[in-house]
Every structure is written in structure tokens, then in C-alpha cells.
Amino acid sequence: TLKIKKKFLRRKKQIIGFKDANRTTNFKIKFPYIFSPSDLRIIGVLIGDGNVRNDRVMLRWIQNDTTPLKKLLSSKIQGYHFSNRETNQLIIPSFFGKITCSLLNLKGDEIDTYKLIEKVIDYPKEYRLALLISLIEDEGNIDPKNYSGISIRMSDKKIVYFIKLLCESLGYETSKITKYKNNRYSFGEGNVMYKLKILSEGIFNLGYDLIKFEKKFGKENSLWKKRKNFFKRWEICAGKKSRKDKEGREIHQK
């Protein structure tokens, strides 16, 4: 974290605002700007249901309800106002793309690819966790009644591979990556997809880390719509582990 802060202290301190190419008003951003896990929670959505256009100028996130990200953005920068009207598309201020590319030495068209994950794997735990939260929110399938784990499905094998590495760096047990064909929305042979599961032991550890993360950074930086189902699933994992540990102690005592 110290290394990250030192990098930002070298930025010009006389900067007093930032004008986004997509807006007419200036954003009020305090400099020197400290790059935090919250920034990765924001920029991480681009890997899932987002995309980058015009070399970081247009950062777009598509979701049925964009309100949680709007609220997070408004808490980060003064002057960011949003309407309560429900929309399925949100333009993220290009500032976040530019500052991320500058710090992580990424090109503008790389922040929605596996390269973002690759760079973050060497960052402190809270940064890695923030990025994983974004990926689970967009691409994870959490069924409290399904004991097979949290499924992450994507068509980009390399992204799934680096998500696996990200999970391993955090100590979360995962399955092997499996390949399958998704025939649901296609004709003919179907689209090739890749699936990774965060297993029960991984969910157990992730749950405790998520609780600590929320206490430090707030629930707005955590899971949003999938939070409720995650903790239902986590409680099942915690209960199973508790019973397993108890049985293990009883065996050793005999």
C-alpha cells in the first residue's frame, strides 16, 4: 500500500479538478489521489458486464440496475450526480480508467481484459479482494441451495484462468476450469464457455474476509445484489465446517 501511495504523491499537486470528456461539469477530486480498493471495485466491473471505447474515454457498464455503482461513484467524487431513474447502462467517469492505467502500466483497451487481473495479483490483499468482488457480482452464480460452489462462467478462457489465480492468491479453493457449450441463446453448435467454481472451503474463507472488508470500506464496496445469497451460502459452509471440525475433534479424543 505504501508503494501505491508514494506513486501518487509524485502526481502534480496543483490539479484541482477533473473534466470528463463525456460530461459538461467538472468533478472535484482531491489530490494527491490515493488509489484504494474502492477504485478496483469500480473499474473491475468492466471485465464483467462492461466495455471500454475510445481508449479509456468511454467506460460503459451494462446491468439491469446500475444504482449501486452510481451510489459508489457519488461517494468517491464530488460533483457526480445521478438520477434515480432506472437505466441499464452507466458511463463511468474516465478518470478511473486513466488513473488505473497510469498506476498499473496498462493501455486503455486493456482494463477490461485479463491484464488488469494479472497486474493486481501482486497488490495487497484488500485490492485483490475488491477486484474479485466485482467479478463475482457480474459473472458469479450464487445459489444458496446448490452445494457445488459459486460458479463463474465466461467465454474468455484467459480471464477465467486469471480469476483462478486471483482466488488462489487469496487462499480460496477452486475447481478446475471446465469447458462447455452454451446453447441457451444460440443456434447450431452454441458458444464455447469456461466455468470455474469457488468451492466450499474457499467460500468459507471468503465470507470472513468479506466481513472484515465491509467493516473497513463499507457495504457499498462489497457485493450488491448477490450479497444476500452469498451469506446464505456462506452460513451453510460455516455450519458444515463446524460440524466437520467437531467430528474431527471427537475422533481424536477417542
What are these regions (language model features)?
Residues 1-254:
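Internal intein/HINT superfamily modules and their associated LAGLIDADG
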